Amino acid sequence: MTATVCLKATRSFLKLNPLPFSRSLSHPKHHHFLSFPKTRISNFATVTMSSSSVVEHIVLFKVKDDTDPSKVNSMVNGLNGLTSLDLTLHLTAGPLLRTRSSPFAFTHLLHSRYKTKDDLAAYTVHPGHLSVVKESVLPICDDVMAVDWVADGLTGPVGPSPGSAIRVTFLKLKEELGEAAKGEILEVIKGIKGKFGEVGQISVGENFSPARAKGYSIASVAVFFEGVSEMEAVDSKEELAKLEKDKVREYLDSVIVLDYVVPSPQSASL
């Protein structure tokens, strides 16, 4: 997204929770594995990658209080309609399931994936995208942020199917941290999938759009293909989760952790 409204944080910090762990409703779903296509993949299609790199794009929105629900629906439907631009590998937008940790009061999320940075750039300036931002997003949102990164070695479905749960984590690092510390953080997050079998996919990388990211420089997405029940199973392993968090906690200045369930096309609106 090109729109960014930088406002003062609306919440005090919650407890730092830099790695993928949470709980709540269960939405189990099955996913099917197909060959990696050369064309666009819709927001509900699932295909597999045999160790590939994708460009991740996540936008967080705070809808103004007391906004007419019909206008919120229009925004969500407009964002999901951007799959028609034939530039995305995957795109989903809708209300957040839960805020685990954040100094900001975000309400909605857009997650999309692209083959290349050029595809993301083309999406960003596309008239269809700009129209949705101008007509449906800016009039009802008083805060927006976006983070972009390249996820290398990603395997599994490129497009999580409806009912899949994702945990989005953004990390703001303490000043003057060296490359060694950044590398350690990235390796710890990459290793989560091997320690928690419920995590179906981990995408992590360094943000390459700093102007829009409020100072958050490392981002990750943990995908739970069978839904929130898998997320809850991971959250129940408190001691193991604490061990992983403690490995990087000293490097962190601020953390955003948000949970989201990929909606069906019919239920994407709020």
PLM region descriptions:
Residues 2-111, 115-125, 139-270:
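Short S/T/G/P-rich N-terminal loop/turn motif that feeds into the first structured element of a domain
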